[in-house]
Amino acid sequence: MAAGSTGERPFFEIITSIRYWVIHAITLPSIFLAGFLFVSTGLAYDAFGTPRPDAYFQASESKAPVVSQRYEGKSELDLRLK
C-alpha cells in the first residue's frame, strides 16, 4: 500500500472487475426502467401532487389565470375553479 493511501480499491480496478459489471448490468437498467414507468404511468403526478398537463387550465380558458392578491392567491384560484 502506498504512503497516504486510505486503503480503498483503485477506481480502475473496480470498473474492470467482473463483479462490478454483474451487479451494475442489472441495477442500472432497472433504475432507468423504474423511473420511466414512474413518469409514463402518471404516478409521478399523483406522488408529488402536481396537476397533469391537461389540468392546468380549464377548457374555456385560453391563458393562465392572473392572481391579483399575493397572499390570497389560493383562494382566488379556488374561486375560479368552481
From Swiss-Prot:
GO terms for cellular component: photosystem II; plasma membrane-derived thylakoid membrane. Disulfide bonds: none annotated. Its main location: membrane. One of its GO terms (biological process) is photosynthetic electron transport chain. It is a single-pass membrane protein. GO terms for molecular function: electron transfer activity; heme binding; iron ion binding. It comes from the Bacteria. Its cofactor is heme b. The chain crosses the membrane at residues 22-36. Belongs to the PsbE/PsbF family. This b-type cytochrome is tightly associated with the reaction center of photosystem II (PSII). PSII is a light-driven water:plastoquinone oxidoreductase that uses light energy to abstract electrons from H(2)O, generating O(2) and a proton gradient subsequently used for ATP formation. It consists of a core antenna complex that captures photons, and an electron transfer chain that converts photonic excitation into a charge separation. Heterodimer of an alpha subunit and a beta subunit. PSII is composed of 1 copy each of membrane proteins PsbA, PsbB, PsbC, PsbD, PsbE, PsbF, PsbH, PsbI, PsbJ, PsbK, PsbL, PsbM, PsbT, PsbX, PsbY, PsbZ, Psb30/Ycf12, peripheral proteins PsbO, CyanoQ (PsbQ), PsbU, PsbV and a large number of cofactors. It forms dimeric complexes. This is Cytochrome b559 subunit alpha. It comes from Synechococcus sp. (strain CC9311). The gene is psbE.
